Amino acid sequence: MRNLKNITILIVSLFLTTQLIAKDKVYKLKMATTWGPTLSPLIDAAQNMAKYANEMSNGRLQIKVDSANKHKSPFGILDMVKAGQYDMGHSASYYFKGKDINTLPFTSMPFGLTAPEQYAWFYEGGGLELMQKVYAKHNVLSFPGGSTGVQMGGWFRKEIKSLDDLQGLKMRIPGFAGEIMARVGVQVTNIAPGELYTALDRNSIDALEWVGPSMDIKMGFHKIAPFYYTGWHEPASEMNFMVNKRVFNKLPKDLQKILTISMRVAAYDMYIQNYDMNATAWQKMKSEYPNIKVTTLPSDVMKALKKANSELRVELGAQSPLLKEVLDSQDNYIKRVREWTKMSDFLYLKDNI
């Protein structure tokens, strides 16, 4: 009887010791990003997420963030996370459309959802579930990773006065907007962020789209291409966090929750950080860079872009039932939420500007 009691005590002690060890175990993950080490606020979102995860887990979840300068593959983030070369990634979903066209809509679609509308779609309208459905084939989980809000339409060497001025123009513009521009006659290319200024300076391109005043001014595009156009193509550009599914499933449940909360908080932090940065840069741009000519695309160009957008969406939907499901979900959500956007934000601004 005494031996049985001793054995029981030993088993319980071993169990408790194992639980304590498991609780105190440190999990170290590596994350690759598309961004350079100074590309705020994009790189900030990744670094802040890692910081939050470390702090909330009391050091049990440590994430090392590698910028594009480290791994040299800014557009290869999905492949590296899928293969297990990195445990996590931070990029933009539409960069992977060449690998999987279904990833396209999760960044932003031309003439689509605004940032508040898109966040509501992700978390209340089924968008996050559709994102997981698309990334499941890659054995990767994907989450919203920070929004730039409305992006500016780009920097051009010459003024665009009509649709004819776009014919043969060489422009860096990614995502679905690139497909639309190609349809109306633009020679479209995609270039990594760190190479944009050089491409413009060396006449490899005639125009480029980047983000907004804060990030654009720091890149110096205005020194070469003074015509700065307002946006139409990315009303709510959302970055994305990716996690290798096998890695995620090996984390204890509490660390899984801490990780998902860290990503969500870092994403929203980037949105408000970028909004403030753009507002500050816009004031600086108006006072310190009078050579910049801010304007909008002519009505005939906008009409052609909207027509191309409608045609291409139908064509893409016919190619992939899953892509059509995502696009239909966004369209249906716009129909429901846009009425409130008009009644709230639009009318408030209309009456107070």
Protein language model features and the residues they cover:
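N-terminal secretory/targeting leader peptides
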Residues: K23-Q118, L128-I353
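Short, low-complexity disordered leader/linker segments with a strong preference
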Residues: M1-K28, L347-I353
